[in-house]
Curated annotation (Swiss-Prot):
Chief site of localization: secreted
Superkingdom to which the source organism belongs: Eukaryota
Tissue: Prismatic layer of shell (at protein level). Expressed primarily in the mantle with highest level in the outer epithelium of the mantle edge and lower level in the mantle pallium.
Region forming the signal peptide: 1-16
Protein name (record): Mantle protein
GO cellular component terms listed in the entry, alphabetical order: extracellular region
Species of origin: Margaritifera margaritifera (Freshwater pearl mussel)
Subcellular localization, as worded in the UniProt entry: Secreted
Keyword terms of this UniProt record: Secreted, Signal
Length: 254
């Protein structure tokens, strides 16, 4: 095969060098650059035909407002605590019991040998810990900003406001009271009522005339009894009995 190729090359060289008349002049072709226009549609994320490619136009409107300090006044409350004590009656007083723990002192009656601790010299190795910084490589995190495009999105104007707010606390002219009502027990006071005799002392006497009717009344006759010993005869013996106290009383209807 190689021999055939060499033979063909020799034959071609012989024919090219054969002179059948005047030779042609040598022409040298110099290549020159050509301008080529490449058309590329921007903001298109679909592989479609060039005729159907529609670029996406985005317009964002921002309303920028100047920074203005805004002062907000807030009242500062002055708090005051007021305690009101209310007492409610109880029949049995409330006793508050507080228990205190008192120490117990124990006396040792048997002498005990006391141990005395003395410092014995010994070798002390004093060391100090020093923190040595070590360079730790910190891996740098590369943040990739993901941008998502939405085709034919309409951006509405949105105001961008950046204002500085300063809060000023102003004290109120009157304090704010915090009312606390404490309800404390108080023993009930029982008052026993005792009957007190009412005595009216009259120190003056006044003589006053009293009308007397004109009616004559007969004074009651009261017998004047003289208490003496009276002797009454008794029986056949002829004796007598002395009865002390006078005579027997006379009946009314005698």
């Amino acid at each position: 095969m190689l021999a055939v190729l060499l033979f063909a090359a020799l034959v071609a060289t012989a024919y090219s060098q054969s002179n059948y008349g005047p030779g042609k002049p040598d022409v040298k072709i110099i290549p020159h650059p050509k301008t080529v226009v490449h058309e590329d549609a921007r903001h298109v994320h679909k592989q479609v035909h060039l005729v159907k490619q529609v670029p996406v136009h985005r317009t964002r409107v921002q309303t920028i407002i100047n920074e203005v300090p805004r002062i907000v006044t807030k009242p500062k409350k002055i708090k005051r605590t007021r305690i009101f004590r209310q007492y409610y009656p109880v029949d049995v007083p409330v006793i508050r019991r507080v228990t205190y723990l008192q120490p117990v002192h124990l006396e040792r009656k048997v002498p005990v040998a006391r141990m005395v601790v003395k410092d014995v010299p010994h070798h002390v190795v004093r060391t100090k810990k020093v923190d040595v910084p070590i360079d730790v490589p910190i891996k740098k995190i590369v943040e990739k900003k993901v941008v998502r495009y939405v085709e034919n999105k309409i951006f509405r104007p949105r105001p961008v406001v950046q204002e500085k707010v300063r809060v000023v606390h102003v004290p109120k002219p009157f304090p704010v009271d915090r009312v606390i009502v404490q309800k404390n027990p108080r023993p009930r006071i029982i008052v026993e009522k005792k009957a007190v005799p009412v005595i009216r002392h009259i120190h003056t006497h006044k003589k006053q005339a009293v009308a007397v009717p004109r009616v004559k009344t007969v004074a009651e006759v009261v017998p004047n009894v003289v208490h003496q010993k009276v002797t009454y005869p008794v029986g056949k013996g002829g004796g007598s009995v002395q009865i002390p106290g006078g005579p027997l009383p006379v009946p009314e209807k005698f």
